Design a protein with these regions (language model features):
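Residue-level signal for inorganic ion chemistry
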Residues: 19, 35, 119, 157, ...
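A glycine/threonine-rich phosphate-anchoring loop and its flanking beta-alpha core
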Residues: 104-194
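Short glycine/serine/threonine-rich phosphate/pyrophosphate-binding segments
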Residues: 97-104, 240
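ATP/NTP phosphate-donor binding region
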Residues: 1-89
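Active-site segments that bind and position negatively charged phosphate/pyrophosphate groups
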Residues: 193-299
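Non-catalytic interfacial helical region
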Residues: 74-93, 102-117
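C-terminal charged capping/lid subdomain of soluble metabolic enzymes
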Residues: 5, 176, 272-355
Length: 355
């Protein structure tokens, strides 16, 4: 079993515990408990929750259309009707969408109720579970409302990945790839040597490595004032692509494409060598992205990038790699020149996109 990680926060310190069986940990939680459960998790592991009173469970349909303030307020109303008080604990099982809703509601209700998180997707295990950040969508725009409110403890049982679909499994790999590129060279080389699917026993190692890298960044810049912005690597274009496809592609898959776009632009800006761009691209194509993405209206994607929260005036703070494999924040003006580079990217990567 992997060693736990202790995360230092200006709000309070919290721990990531790597566990063998979530059922044992769940049974050991004491006090007054209320549960926020991904419906899919409940259906797959119903027997594990058999001893819980149904009226204490708020079921989540984990789709982007539900990641809004309407769902947050529904959960808060559920807390009120159940009689939840400050000394209760909110127990959350699910991926990033369920996490976002539980974070926001727990933070707002009674000015903070403690919550605990069992991430059940690879994406939430290897990235979103730490850092305390949540994002709530407004209309078609992603993550326009948010707070920083970390769980009191995170319990990672990697056996949950055994029941993930191939698409959901792929979702987490963009974040692992991101951290491998910015860690020591050995991490990236290890990842390159792996097959597309890694068993539970081995994947825990990569989850731990990725979280350890993220821990360094969020402890130095918890509230995203500067350094933490580098964690948006791949997300700027990824979020725009999600919105463009009306969430037909999943977040993690969009981020992997976003990493490829960011690397292409970094090469064109002279920040990295072409060899690094092509090497990462080859890994992405072999292990991650095997389907074609159709972009008929690149100008629409570019316009969606303009709505990114990192835009100031007409300048975007773009997270990119440099030659030392460090993530940096590189300002780029959202003008005709950048749009032309984006279109050039689409034209030169026709095996990924059809523009």
């Amino acid at each position: 079993m992997m060693e736990h990680l202790d995360i230092h926060s200006n709000l309070y310190d919290y721990r990531v515990s790597f566990i063998d069986d979530f059922r044992t940990t769940l049974a050991q939680l004491g006090g007054e408990l209320v549960y926020v459960l991904d419906w899919n998790v409940y259906r797959l592991y119903e027997s594990a929750f058999a001893g819980i009173e149904r009226q204490r469970i708020f079921f989540m349909d984990p789709v982007e259309e539900k990641k809004n303030m309407y769902t947050v307020l529904n959960l808060i109303s559920f807390f009120q009707q159940l009689g939840v008080r400050k000394n209760w604990k909110v127990i959350c099982f699910g991926g990033g969408i369920t996490q976002d809703i539980a974070t926001m509601a727990s933070n707002l209700f009674l000015r903070n109720v403690d919550w605990y998180f069992f991430p059940t997707t690879l994406l939430s295990m290897c990235d979103s579970c730490i850092g305390g950040k949540c994002g709530i969508n407004v209309g078609a725009y992603k993550n326009q409302i948010g707070v920083f409110y970390p769980p009191k403890e995170i319990f990672i049982d990697a056996h949950f990945i055994d029941t993930l679909s191939p698409a959901d499994y792929l979702n987490g790999w963009g974040e692992i790839l991101k951290f491998s590129l910015t860690s020591d060279a050995a991490f990236y080389e290890e990842l390159k040597a792996e097959s597309s699917y890694i068993p539970c026993e081995r994947i825990t190692y990569y989850i731990h490595r990725g979280l350890a890298e993220k821990k360094k960044i969020i402890e130095a810049d918890e509230f995203e004032s500067d350094l933490r912005r580098v964690l948006n690597y791949g997300h700027t274009f990824g979020h725009a692509l999600e919105a463009y496809t009306k969430h037909a592609i999943a977040h993690g898959t969009a981020v992997i494409w976003g990493i490829d776009v960011a690397n292409y632009l970094a090469w064109k800006e002279g920040l990295i060598d072409e060899s690094l761009y092509l090497d990462v691209k080859a890994l992405i194509k072999r292990a991650f992205l095997k389907e074609e993405m159709v972009i008929d209206e690149p100008h629409t994607v570019f316009d969606l990038i303009r709505t990114d929260k990192k835009v100031r005036g007409n300048t975007l703070s773009f997270a990119m790699l440099d030659r030392k494999s460090h993530l940096i924040v590189h300002p780029m003006v959202l003008d005709a020149s950048l749009y032309r580079k984006f279109c050039d990217y689409l034209e030169t990567t026709h095996d990924y996109y059809r523009a």
